[in-house]
Amino acid sequence: MLAGGGTAGHVNPLLATADRLADLGHSIEVIGTQEGLESRLVPDRGYKLTAISKLPFPRKLGLSTISFPFKFLAISLRLRKRVREADVVVGFGGYVSAPVYLAAKIFGTPLVIHEANALPGIANRFGSKLTKHVAISFPSKLAGELIGVPLREEIASAEGYDIGQARVELGLDPSKPVLLVTGGSQGAQKINRVVVEATDKLRAAGVQVYHIAGSGNEYPEKISDGYVRVSYCNSMELAIRACDFAISRAGAATVSELTAMGVPALFIPYPVGNGEQRHNVAQLIEADASLIVEDKDFDVEFINSELIPVLSSKKRLKEMGQKMKQFGKLDATEKLVTMALGAIK
């Protein structure tokens, strides 16, 4: 049984782990919600999704604080049959995971936790108190084995793709450099707007742009000379393989995919939340493997004065790419699967 959901940082490593376990002959059930990315991606991958209510931990005192423990326990108890039938529960975080963790503890099913971010979320901080089997992706305050983020096989094996062919399949010129732009699984309005405004400057510098704008964005899909904009990319392995550099948020899934493939990036940490995204890329920035800018400081002038000079230097791009590759971890899926199967014994 795998539990987790919400954003790509929880769902992508869950799917990578599910695929490997399925390859080894194990049956898979995923516990998630109807609201998160898992509601679409898990069934599309061929796995059974059992949806439960998402119950956020209360952030301040109020009526919800009083009722929370009872609702939380009720969800855990409703999972009794499924959790007891499972040989192991592997959790990837997100609010949906926490009741599953408690159910595993109550009913004696081995529990494994994977934390994708440098700053662990509430659910995984809670879950880590219930088990000794904890895996982490970055140096973290959470005690656990440092393994990295499990990557889908398509990403892990993408180095075998021909770069020129990848560009052609994406509608780009195989002979010109490519900038990949993505705001993460949910898109990013600020990134979209600035990149659209800077497109002419980028093309004038000889840089092609593959722009993944995200679902629900205000910009329609578009293909023109040296610029391709899509709402969603079903083949991120192609997009990453095709590019020389990326502009991205700093979510754990994206950071891990870029490091695995040695693609440097300009990271723009999500400005809301607990600051986890800045921590996810701290080592990369310190090593000069990538760049970082605050969301409020990202504008057309920054692209023109800071980014285009980097994109125009083959030497700088090569050096940064080599440094990124040093941080890549391609064996995280195997390590997590080994931990999960070992917890059963």
PLM region spans:
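C-terminal alpha-helical cap of glycosyltransferases
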Residues: 329-345
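Active-site-proximal region of nucleotide-activated glycan assembly enzymes
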Residues: 27, 37, 106-164
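Donor-nucleotide binding loops and adjacent catalytic segments primarily
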Residues: 36, 41-45, 161-168, 172-248, ...
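A short acidic/histidine/glycine-rich donor-binding loop in glycosyltransferase catalytic cores
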Residues: 265, 283-296, 308-309
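Short amphipathic alpha-helix
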Residues: 10-21
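Glycosyltransferases and closely related glycan-assembly transferases
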Residues: 46-48, 77-90, 97-112, 125-133
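Conserved nucleotide-sugar phosphate-binding/catalytic loop shared by glycosyltransferases and other
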Residues: 2-5, 22-74, 78, 294-297
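A short, well-ordered alpha-helix in the C-terminal region of glycosyltransferases
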Residues: 309, 316-330
